[in-house]
UniProtKB/Swiss-Prot annotation:
It comes from Pseudomonas aeruginosa (strain UCBPP-PA14). InterPro entries: Aminoglycoside_PTrfase, Homoserine_kinase_II, Kinase-like_dom_sf, Pseudomonas-type_ThrB. Gene3D superfamilies: 3.90.1200.10, Phosphorylase Kinase, domain 1. Belongs to the pseudomonas-type ThrB family. The lineage of its organism: Bacteria, Pseudomonadati, Pseudomonadota, Gammaproteobacteria, Pseudomonadales. It catalyses: L-homoserine + ATP = O-phospho-L-homoserine + ADP + H(+). Its EC number is 2.7.1.39. Keywords: Amino-acid biosynthesis, ATP-binding, Kinase, Nucleotide-binding, Threonine biosynthesis, Transferase. This is Homoserine kinase. Pathway: Amino-acid biosynthesis; L-threonine biosynthesis; L-threonine from L-aspartate: step 4/5.
Length: 316
């Protein structure tokens, strides 16, 4: 179970008291998390999720709180930070920054079809539309410079075939970092995977885990999302799912010609980002009782993205 900071019941009860949500009925750790400690918390007046933030600078947490407030106010189904009776949203528990949020209904969709992907494309388009007019600035701590640094560090330890795949991808990232093309920007979720979306029946009911959120190119966020939701087991893209997601997104925001030009490379960049972070996690948590996602999944996806046949619709 990926709970890095276990909690005693009495400690949790004392923490929850200022929210005036009634007595604690039950709580349990959430196994799916791979970076933070998360708990389902059942209180007299509702169901909630408690997050202890284990990674990242504490000074960035007000950004996440403000972003979720903006998205919640725009009607997106996101968890927002609850306030205590004194108006506090960000607190500390067992020495870690802690947030209490409403628990959203629904379940993860492990085998999405075109309908699920259409819902996700519409959701991402809504998220970008809600923030592009007033972007809350936060650079990603796993952006292009991070990829170049970590790629160089990891490459010598990779098998020859993996190094041969990574090297041209890093060269492409270096060129993109130098060019910094004027692609449209907004706030990004930057981790919109299947395990961060909740469906209640056929309807998308929630988007969670914003702790990688940042500001940046909307196209990059779209590439991250499509790589997970529309990939087959061998890493190739499923055309029906991919086109459903892209069409729904385009209904919210038409693409530009520059985005169409950079689309294939952005899909590859998004693969590299998660291949590297998974390799790092696999080394750091080897032998521990922590959920580790398979790095090979994104190695396969990067190999499949060398020739991209799914293009952006309605490019202007």
């Amino acid at each position: 179970m990926s709970v890095f900071t276990p909690l005693e019941r009495s400690t949790l009860e004392a923490f929850l008291a200022p929210y005036d949500l009634g007595r604690l009925r039950d709580f349990r750790g959430i196994a799916e998390g791979s970076e933070n400690s998360n708990f389902f918390v059942s209180l007299e007046h509702g169901e909630f999720v408690l997050t202890l933030v284990e990674r990242g600078p504490v000074q960035d947490l007000p950004f996440f709180i403000e972003l979720l407030d903006v998205l919640h106010e725009d009607g997106l189904p996101v968890p927002y930070a609850l306030r205590t009776r004194d108006g506090e949203a960000l607190r500390r528990l067992e020495g870690k920054p802690a947030l209490l949020q409403p628990r959203l209904a629904g379940r993860h969709e492990r085998q999405p079809n075109a309908h699920h992907c259409q819902e996700v494309g519409d959701l991402l388009g809504h998220l970008h539309a809600a923030t592009r007019g007033r972007i809350l600035e936060r650079p990603s701590d796993r952006g292009l410079p991070w990829m170049l640094e970590q790629g160089a560090n990891l490459a010598p330890r990779l098998p020859e075939q993996a190094r041969a795949l990574l090297a041209p991808a890093l060269a492409e990232i270096a060129a993109l970092d130098a060019e910094r093309p004027a692609l449209p920007r907004a706030n990004l979720h930057a981790d919109l995977f299947r395990d961060n979306v909740l469906f209640d029946g056929p309807h998308l009911a929630g988007l969670i885990d914003f702790y990688n959120a940042c500001s940046g190119w909307m196209l990059y966020d779209l590439a991250i999302t499509l790589n997970d939701w529309c990939s087959n087991a061998d890493g190739s893209l499923d055309p029906a799912r991919a086109r459903a997601l892209l069409a729904a997104y385009a209904n919210r925001r038409p693409f530009t010609a520059l985005e169409a030009e950079h689309w294939p490379s952005m899909l590859r960049v998004a693969c590299v980002r998660f291949w590297l972070s998974r390799l790092i996690a696999a080394e750091a948590f080897a032998g521990q009782d922590v959920l580790i996602h398979d790095p090979a999944e994104f190695e396969m996806r990067l190999a499949q993205r060398q020739n991209v046949e799914i293009h952006l619709p309605f490019a202007l």
